[in-house]
Amino acid sequence: MSSVKDTMTTQVATVSPNQTIQEAASLMKQHNVGAIPVVEQGVLKGMLTDRDIALRTTAQGRDGQTPVSEVMSTELVSGNPNMSLEDASQLMAQHQIRRLPIVDQNNLVGIVALGDLAVNQMSNESAGSALTNISHQNIH
């Protein structure tokens, strides 16, 4: 069975907590990503998604100079490089996330996206299940 380290993206664009939302959004546009890890001295501190920007910045009347630390999601779900793709898929489905940061001794070493799992033959069923669970989130 393939492990996360064989599939994860290791060249991950990141931002620091003290960068501005405008800088983060520009970096997200440049790399064509909907989420970016927030890292300080190699340690994963949070994730910033396009949804975070829309709901916690724009919708609240804040401007682009708002620090990432005030907008990022800090309740993190992460995986480790040695976990199986099956386990990563299940974790993503359970927490309804499309991107799973991969950490080793608290340091960000990569990221696995739902699309990465979908292209791996061994986890196609799990990726489909994860996508189904993410797409059918419970309304609260």
UniProtKB/Swiss-Prot annotation:
Record keywords: CBS domain, Repeat
Domain named CBS: residues: 8-64, 72-127
Superkingdom, taxonomy of origin: Bacteria
SUPFAM superfamilies: CBS-domain pair (SSF54631)
Protein name (database record): CBS domain-containing protein YhcV
One Pfam family here: CBS
InterPro entries, per database record: CBS_dom (IPR000644), CBS_dom_sf (IPR046342), Diverse_CBS-Domain (IPR051257)
The encoding gene: yhcV
PROSITE patterns documented for this protein: CBS
